[in-house]
């Protein structure tokens, strides 16, 4: 079967997923592809494991930016693809291979037929962690080419191909990682009175955390704490000296995030006192909410609905986290969901996006960018 140029690019990228700030092969692939465009109006900068590309406009008055995240996830792939990951224990399970491919397609179209305004493409590492958007935004490499408008997309397995979904205002939640390390006194299982059991302490903590949302967050607001991993102990007959909880916090408002963290800290302090142990809280990476610029989003939705073949859906906000929110704090813009019709969802080992969505996205985004960046 003959596949299109950009489907092949997606498959090439799918084979080489890499985690945050280790995307060296992916960066090399992007740079090699850009090299084939060989256009005098293209400038390229390297930032860590990312790439920033500028296509000079014919008569620029503003800079339009497109951001694509490029990293993969530490997940063992189960798709059965012939082009499955060749990196053991790694997979593009969040669609960043599609995001990057669409960016390269849009870049190709921009070089082929230049618009009036400058275009800047941000191939950003480490969206899945520890977070590449904020340091890229603050980098010297980007300051010179900082966009006036920026857009980004994320694949949506639940929507059919040929649809996009977005909304004005809040789209994605504030998110924070959560790590709690407990240290007590280990001992023999036959003498529990001489030890401080950190398995029991961790169990109490998980249970108490369930009250944080239900009794501290306005029912008309929304927030969630998920503890996804607990570790502790060594063997079955030794009382654990240490335990560790790992999870996430997600809120729809900045105020709720602050309130939730305050309650977590109070509960952990209570665990310390009750179990005579030491506790350390680490919030790890935190991502700011994705808040779409109202006027630009409304304009985009209207254009896509009236001027392209894509169907536009007004969605509700999601508890998903995205470090693109940091870019939208400083640069007016928006993010949208791109339908890819997969039976399995994001971060699943069997995620199989419909590749037909790739060229549909390139075509309609090229239409939008040409309309937005060309003086009438």
Curated annotation (Swiss-Prot):
Gene3D superfamilies per the UniProt record, alphabetical? 3.30.70.360, Zn peptidases
> Could you confirm whether the keyword Amino-acid biosynthesis appears in this record?
yes
* A Pfam family this chain is assigned to: M20_dimer
- The record places the active site at 69, 128
Reported function: Catalyzes the conversion of N-acetyl-diaminopimelate to diaminopimelate and acetate.
Pathway assigned in UniProt: Amino-acid biosynthesis; L-lysine biosynthesis via DAP pathway; LL-2,6-diaminopimelate from (S)-tetrahydrodipicolinate (acetylase route): step 3/3
The similarity comment for this entry is:
Belongs to the peptidase M20A family. N-acetyldiaminopimelate deacetylase subfamily.
Q: Which InterPro entries match?
A: AcetylDAP_deacetylase, Amidohydrolase, Bact_exopeptidase_dim_dom, Peptidase_M20, Peptidase_M20_dimer
Organism superkingdom: Bacteria
As recorded in UniProt, its EC number(s) are 3.5.1.47
HAMAP family, per database record:
DapEL (MF_01692)
- What is the designated name of this protein? N-acetyldiaminopimelate deacetylase
The UniProt GO MF terms for this protein read: N-acetyldiaminopimelate deacetylase activity
Query: Could you tell me which CDD domains the record lists for this protein?
Result: M20_Acy1_YkuR-like
Q: Which UniProt keywords apply?
A: Amino-acid biosynthesis, Diaminopimelate biosynthesis, Hydrolase, Lysine biosynthesis
């Amino acid at each position: 079967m003959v596949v299109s140029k950009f489907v092949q690019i997606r498959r090439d990228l799918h084979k080489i997923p890499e985690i945050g700030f280790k995307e060296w092969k992916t960066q090399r692939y992007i740079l090699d592809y850009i090299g084939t465009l060989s256009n005098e109006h293209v400038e390229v900068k390297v930032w860590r494991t990312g790439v920033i590309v500028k296509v000079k406009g014919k008569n620029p008055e503003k800079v339009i930016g497109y951001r694509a995240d490029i990293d993969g996830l530490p997940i063992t792939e189960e798709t059965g693809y012939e082009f499955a990951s060749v990196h053991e224990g790694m997979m593009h399970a969040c669609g960043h291979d599609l995001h990057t491919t669409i960016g390269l397609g849009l870049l190709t179209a921009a070089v082929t037929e230049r618009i009036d305004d400058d275009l800047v493409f941000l191939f950003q590492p480490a969206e899945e962690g520890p977070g590449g958007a904020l340091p890229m935004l603050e980098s010297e490499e980007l300051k010179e080419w900082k966009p006036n408008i920026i857009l980004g997309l994320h694949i949506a397995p639940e929507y059919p191909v040929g649809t996009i979904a977005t909304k004005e205002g809040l789209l994605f939640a504030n998110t924070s990682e959560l790590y709690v390390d407990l240290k007590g006194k280990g001992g023999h299982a036959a003498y529990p009175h001489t030890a401080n059991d950190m398995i029991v302490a961790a169990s109490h903590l998980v249970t108490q955390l369930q009250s944080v949302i239900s009794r501290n967050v306005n029912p008309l607001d929304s927030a969630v704490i998920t503890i996804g991993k607990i570790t502790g102990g060594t063997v079955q007959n030794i009382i654990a000296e240490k335990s560790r909880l790992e999870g996430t916090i997600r809120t729809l408002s900045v105020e709720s995030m602050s309130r939730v963290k305050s309650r977590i800290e109070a509960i952990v302090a209570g665990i310390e006192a009750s179990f005579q142990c030491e506790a350390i809280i680490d919030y790890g990476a935190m991502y700011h909410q994705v808040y779409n610029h109202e006027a630009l989003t409304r304009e985009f939705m209207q254009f896509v609905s009236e001027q392209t073949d894509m169907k536009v859906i007004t969605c509700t906000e999601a508890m998903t986290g995205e470090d693109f929110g940091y870019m939208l704090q400083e640069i007016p813009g928006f993010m949208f969901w791109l339908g890819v019709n997969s039976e399995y969802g994001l971060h699943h080992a069997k995620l199989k996006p419909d590749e037909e969505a790739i060229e549909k996205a390139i075509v309609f985004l090229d239409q939008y960018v040409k309309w937005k960046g060309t003086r009438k």
